[in-house]
Structures are given as C-alpha cells and as structure tokens.
Regions:
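A generic secondary-structure signal marking the coil-to-beta-strand transition
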Residues: 48, 64-66, 87-88, 113
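A structural signal for short, well-ordered beta-strand segments and their strand-loop junctions
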Residues: 67-69, 146-149
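Nuclease catalytic cores
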Residues: 41, 45, 49
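A short acidic/basic microdomain associated with nuclease active sites
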Residues: 62-74
Length: 262
C-alpha cells in the first residue's frame, strides 16, 4: 500500500487546499449564461461592433495570445454569478488562444479586459458613463475605456492613471491613441475605426476582399491598355511598311536613284 503523500498534500497546506477546492468548485463558462439574450439596440450598433472586432482580427492575423469579443458576458464575481457585464467590445491581452462562451474572470486567473468600448444608446448612456465606468475603473482596473455613440458620433476616451480614469484629449485629427493595441481610434465616414500610426483605416475582411478585387480590376485594365498600345504600335508599323512599299512601286528604289545621279 502506497502511503506516500500526494504532491498536492506536500505543497499545499490545509487552508490553501480548502481555498483551492473552493476555487475548483466555482462555475465555469459552461455553467454560466453567455449573454442576456437581448439584441443590440440598433442594427447600426451591431455593425459598429463587428467593424471593431473584425478589423482588429485582420490586423492581428499573425498575432497570438489575445482574446477579442463583443456583446457577451464578462463574469467578474465568483460569489454571485448574476453579477456580470456585457461590453459591446472588449480586448484581453496575454491570454490563451481559444474560443470562449463568455469571459469568466476566475477561470482566467482573475484577468479582466485591457480595453472596453461601449456603444451607448438612449437607454444605456447613463449606465455606461456612470455605473460601468466606476466598475471598470475600480474593480477591473482596466487601462482603457472608450464610449462611442454610433448615431450622434459622441466619442469619449478614458485612460487609467494611478487609481483614477482621466479623460483623454483627442489630437488635431480627433483621434485617440490606444497603447494596448498600438493603434488609434478615430471617426471615419461616421464609424469608429482602428487607424494605423500612419493614419490608414484598418480594413475588415470584406474591405480587404474589395481592395483585392479593385487591384485585380486595375491590373486587368492596365494589361488591356498595354495590349491596346502594343496593337496600335503594330498597326503603325504595318502602315509605315505599306507606305514604303507604295512609294517603291510608284517611284522605284529612291535610294538607288540618288546614287545614280551622283
């Protein structure tokens, strides 16, 4: 009979073992709701959310160790599974790459989002600017919090300095730099977009496909133009040969005639 203590018994004292057992008994994403089942306020809100998520994934196609989601629950209180928030967009850095039904902080080593973007509406604006801001600042200790109203285009950003959020002043082009992503956030054609440091809009997969199609069309048009120019040059050469032949038939070898005259 093996009476040797287990590795866990050797390394963990009784109090820690009790805490660990309690932690293991906590609900996981499989036990918790992933969202509230309510659709986003308007189709424009959903399209705005998808723009932010899809374009960042494209920009970071070769990057690993992050999670980006939207309109799904972030569970933050292990003692009360009903305490959760459903940010319209959130980003967590330096985490395991995998799909998730919801973000469960205690299942992720008490990791909270690094960036949240809320898309206020008439019914959520007060909560987004008040209660949620206080939660993200005080409990999440989240570095960057942004609010963008897809209809009024009101855009506000907060960065955490010390223990408090400070509103970020937009630059001359009315954009804000996100340290977490290395990108800017700015309004382009009525939408909040990720921008490179050079000012280019980070495209979505659809926009990338459209750009590729435009490049292919331009290349095809250029090839057709070059073919047309080549055909025109060939026609001019043929016309020149025909003109020379006509002169020779009418006047003979002009060069030979000049030699005889000399």
């Amino acid at each position: 009979m093996d009476l040797a203590p287990s590795l866990e018994t050797e390394l963990i004292d009784p109090d820690e073992a009790e805490i660990l057992a309690s932690f293991r008994a906590l609900p996981t994403e499989d036990d918790l709701p992933c969202d509230d089942g309510e659709p986003m306020e308007t189709p424009r809100h959903r399209e705005q959310m998808n723009l932010l998520i899809d374009s960042l994934k494209v920009h970071w196609a070769d990057r690993t160790g992050y999670y980006v989601g939207g309109n799904m629950f972030v569970h933050y209180d292990p003692e009360n599974k009903r305490r959760s928030r459903g940010p319209d967009f959130f980003l967590v850095l330096n985490v395991v790459d995998r799909e998730r039904k919801s973000w469960v902080a205690w299942q992720e080593g008490m990791r909270f989002p690094d960036v949240i973007i809320e898309l206020p509406s008439d019914t959520t604006r007060a909560v987004d600017k008040g209660e949620k801001k206080g939660l993200y600042e005080g409990l999440f200790r989240m570095a960057e919090y942004y609010l963008y109203d897809p209809w009024s285009q009101e855009f506000i950003g907060y960065h955490l300095h010390g223990m408090r959020y400070h509103e970020v002043e937009r630059d001359a082009e009315r954009k804000i730099y996100s340290t977490a992503t290395g990108l800017y956030l700015g309004i382009r054609e009525g939408w909040l977009r990720w921008l490179t440091v050079e000012g280019a809009v980070v495209p979505t997969p659809l926009e990338l496909a459209e750009q590729a199609g435009q490049r292919a069309t331009q290349a095809e048009q250029q090839a057709e133009q070059e073919k047309h120019r080549a055909e025109q040059a060939e026609q001019r050469a043929e016309q020149a040969e025909q003109l020379v032949a006509m002169y020779r038939r009418r006047f003979g070898d002009l060069g030979g005639g000049r030699e005889q005259e000399q």
